[in-house]
A protein has these predicted regions:
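PLP-dependent enzyme catalytic core of the Aspartate aminotransferase-like
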Residues: 1-4, 85, 126, 135, ...
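N-terminal "arm"/small-domain region of PLP-dependent enzymes with the aminotransferase-like
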Residues: 2-68, 76-77, 411
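Conserved PLP-enzyme active-site core in the AAT-like
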Residues: 2-9, 21-25, 87-317, 325
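Short, acidic Gly/Pro/Ser/Thr-rich loop/turn segments
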Residues: 25, 43-47, 235-236, 297, ...
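Conserved N-terminal alpha-helix of the aminotransferase class I/II PLP-enzyme fold
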Residues: 46-98, 120-128
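Short amphipathic alpha-helical segments
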Residues: 59, 85, 286, 290, ...
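Conserved C-terminal alpha-helix-loop-beta "cap" of PLP-dependent enzymes
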Residues: 301, 309, 315-411, 415
Length: 435
């Protein structure tokens, strides 16, 4: 019997997160670990070789702002884990979202976005991108008639998050993808809170997936980065909405990204144009750290979820708690069904609860936590807590906060991987301190 080739094996997630991009030892040094390539630029073999690289005829390295071998392995690996054809790593999650929007919409265009998204993304769409002529309409992601009614002739995409921020509502990716595709526009999904280990949005109809790699991918609160994954499934030539992707690009000798770079047209356009010209480049050191994070992603996420579900049960029975916002205990039949469909192995280690007593009591509770750290990050192996109304969503007015499900007494928790008894004891001590 002939030996089955490595690339032909149906490898599982836990194996892919360790091997994709470097299936064999480094060909130059025989190192098994991915090397960190700290170089600003790359030597061309001759002038023709250089010209071919710059003309996109040869897909090799040109300059460190655009590509790097360490980054390339990270991009290959996260693309494989998400089920995409290509990925682009950038300097932050905010940069990933900004590039995704700027590659899909220009001045005079429009984006429909769920209103239960990260405060920074809300601010980008509501206040920053309008300065560049890109408008946004925020919708209830569970009101499908409202979503469809918000789509206009100049709408270029719908954007949602797999799990809402900060209350972890589960959205129906397939349903919203169907609405987007009915109108000939792509669906962008921020999968930061779920990770591809729990949910792979592309399998449910998403066209573009983005992550703040700072969160679960890195996992240890050490490194800033973001990533865009191109599903390769959206047909950019189906209409005249994206001429910059379809028509010959004068800055690349007439290359048509949709025709010459398919199926990875979207990711290639961002790298070749936006990254080239605005340079939100990820450091190869950061890419290396994210690769190390991916190697333990499944193990960490399992523990995060296990601990979170136990904390949810504890908070449900805590008399000082008014309400716990977590899909696993939702009384809404739609949420129950969506959680079962998209999160069969559980999910939502970042969630909120409402404490009795208002904003002052919420802040007093947080100030009495010791094991939990008060900081703006989430998805660290260490447990974290924050008061969203005065921090992550502070740019929103009172009406906007309530519209996003954030009250003055809302506390967001990001449950880490510590021993669950220690996590619950810390919460119990904080409740006791504010009695």
């Amino acid at each position: 019997m002939s030996k089955k080739h490595y690339a032909d094996r149906n490898l599982k997630f836990e194996t892919l997160q360790l091997h994709v991009g470097q299936e064999q030892a480094d060909p130059v040094t025989d190192a098994r670990a991915v090397p960190i390539y700290l170089t600003s630029s790359y030597v061309f073999h001759n002038c023709q070789h250089a010209a071919d690289r710059f003309g996109l005829k040869d897909a090799g390295n040109i300059y460190g702002r655009l590509t790097n071998p360490t980054e390339d392995i990270f991009e290959q690996r996260i693309a494989a884990l998400e089920g995409g054809v290509a990925a682009l790593a950038v300097g932050s999650g905010a940069a990933a979202l900004t590039y995704a929007f700027q590659a899909i919409a220009h001045a005079g265009d429009h984006i429909v976005a769920a209103k239960n998204i990260y405060g920074g993304t809300y601010n980008l769409l509501a206040h920053t991108l309008p300065d560049y002529g890109i408008e946004a309409t925020f919708v209830d992601p569970f009101n499908y008639e409202e979503i469809e009614a918000a789509i206009k002739d100049n709408t270029k995409a719908i954007e949602i998050e797999t799990l809402g921020n900060p209350n972890s509502e589960v959205v129906d990716i397939e349903k919203i993808a169907g609405i987007a595709h009915k109108h000939g526009i792509p669906l962008i999904v921020d999968n930061t809170f779920a990770t591809p280990y729990l949910v792979r949005p592309i399998e449910h109809g998403a066209d573009i997936v983005v992550h703040s790699a700072t969160k679960f991918i890195g996992g240890h609160g050490t490194t800033i980065g973001g990533v865009i994954i191109d599903s390769g499934k959206f047909d950019w030539t189906q209409s005249s909405k994206w001429p910059w992707l379809v028509e010959p690009n004068v800055s690349y000798h007439g290359v048509s990204f949709a025709k010459d770079c398919a199926p990875a047209a979207f990711a290639t356009y961002i790298r070749a144009i936006l990254l080239r010209d605005t340079g939100a480049t990820i450091s190869p050191v950061h890419a290396f750290i994210f690769l190390q994070g991916l190697e333990t992603l499944s193990l960490r996420v399992e523990r995060h979820v296990e601990n979170a579900l136990k904390v949810v049960k504890y908070l449900e029975n805590q008399p000082q708690v008014e309400k716990v916002n977590h899909p696993s205990i939702s009384k809404d039949p739609e949420q129950q069904a969506l959680y079962k469909k998209y999160f069969p192995n559980g999910g939502g280690s970042i969630f909120t609860f409402e404490i009795k007593g208002g904003a002052e009591k919420a802040q007093e509770f947080i100030d009495n936590l010791e094991l939990f750290s008060l900081l703006a990050n989430v998805a660290d192996v260490k447990s974290l807590a924050i008061h969203p109304a005065s921090t992550t969503h502070s740019e929103c007015n009172e009406a906007e906060l309530l519209d996003q499900g954030i009250k003055p007494n809302t506390i967001r928790l990001s449950i880490g991987t510590e021993n669950i008894d220690d996590i619950i004891e810390d919460l119990a001590e904080a409740f006791k301190a504010i009695e």
